[in-house]
Amino acid sequence: MRFRNPVRRALRYVLVDRHRAELRAHVEEARALEKLGAEQTAEMQRQRLARVLTHAAVHVPYYRDLLPQYGVLDASGNARPERLAELPFLDKATLAEQFDRLRSDDADARDWVVNRSGGSTGEPTRFVQDRGYRAWAEAVKVVRDAWAGIRPGDRRALLWGSARDLFEGREAWKTRLRRWSLNQLWINAFYASEEAMASHLAQLRRFQPTYLLGYAPNLHELALFAERCSTRVPSLRSIASGAGTLYPHMRDDIERGFGAPVFNRYGSREFGAIAGDCELRMGLHVAAPHVIVEVIRPDGSRADPYESGEIVVTSLTNFSMPLIRYRIGDRGATSDRRCACGCGWPLLDRVEGRMTDTFVHPEGGIVSPTGLIHLAGALVREGWIRRFQFVQESVEEVTIRIVPEGETATAAERHGDATSELTQAVQEMMGPRSRVRIQFVESILPSASGKHLSTICKVKPSPGATLR
């Protein structure tokens, strides 16, 4: 299946490979760095961070002013990477306000482009990324793919939904040729009716991919549909969840529905590949040559291993716009285990989803709706819920939107006991003051980035609010 067509090989060279000498060098380096032990990996990251900080202090106006205030530079102007935790965080508002001052004054020599986030939680965020960053982001993806048994050129199908990446009928001919040359099939995850999912499965069976990448909720829904229809895609060797939170019950359902192992991936527009499962799936290996990941408490201190907190990321490869201690907007936890696979890159124990996925408790603090999602997931497996969404409308009001199987108009009568169980679960989590409304709907629209959001909170938590 790998580039046997000479026309495909030639087209890949014209559109892709002739520009990728830098990528190939980075892939070789990343494969060597993957073999480092934990202590050697930490030293490698320290050296790479020192280069980023030294560059930022000289060439990035924002950091030229900021870094000397926090003792990150010694008397000779050399960076002190061990002082990283003393630097203030960079948030999306500051990135927008200081965009020009965050861009390096030597960026024009680095072949930079402006990229944007998907905007699932509001307006998309702009940032600059250069050729070196792009090559490194792709290189760590190649290493990560190898953990899942995927090689460059293997047939890949992508169940994707970002309007920026995929919109039927509007792709340029060069984009289509590029995807054909790369052995890729793109399927629009925006379309999720039963007719659309039957079409998706038919396309997959015709294309015979060895690898399927998609949004976790969309993969989950398609896998359940495939199971109901007794339809398999026998060519699949592995599946990757590339966006959205992959909950344990979802992983189990996807593996059962498609008959292939699921690998969890964590990344973003700002940083590309951040972390991912290896073949042992003991946690997500952070892409150590590419990023540093911290998990912080509400007071800004670093969380202990396995303690839930806010994820903060520092780029080690984007010199045109270094994002240092960037609040990416997600929750998760680190791990102190050393993976038996032999890779010394640090582990994330889990990624819990967006910071905005948490709910505000009427009596103070924030609560994680993970238990609700597990409960709703069990009802999905019972076969009467197609899709669900929990929305906190106010401090004391939660709406549960449900797309049922069968007639929407009669769903409340048919499933009263199950909805009572959901209502009770919300009230136990949110307290006796909470009011819960069940709303049966025909469909639930995805976010602007194409993701199905299982939870939405319209209430702003108090500063420093902690998990209850």
PLM features per residue range, with description:
Residues 1-116, 122-138, 142-155, 162, ...:
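Nucleotide 5′-phosphate-binding alpha/beta core
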Residues 51, 162-289:
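Conserved adenylate-forming
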Residues 156, 184, 262, 293, ...:
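Generic structural signal for residues in well-ordered beta-strands
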Residues 157-159, 312:
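Short, well-ordered beta-strand segments
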Residues 212, 317-432:
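AMP-binding/adenylate-forming catalytic core of the ANL superfamily
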Residues 246-338, 355:
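Conserved AMP-binding/adenylate-forming
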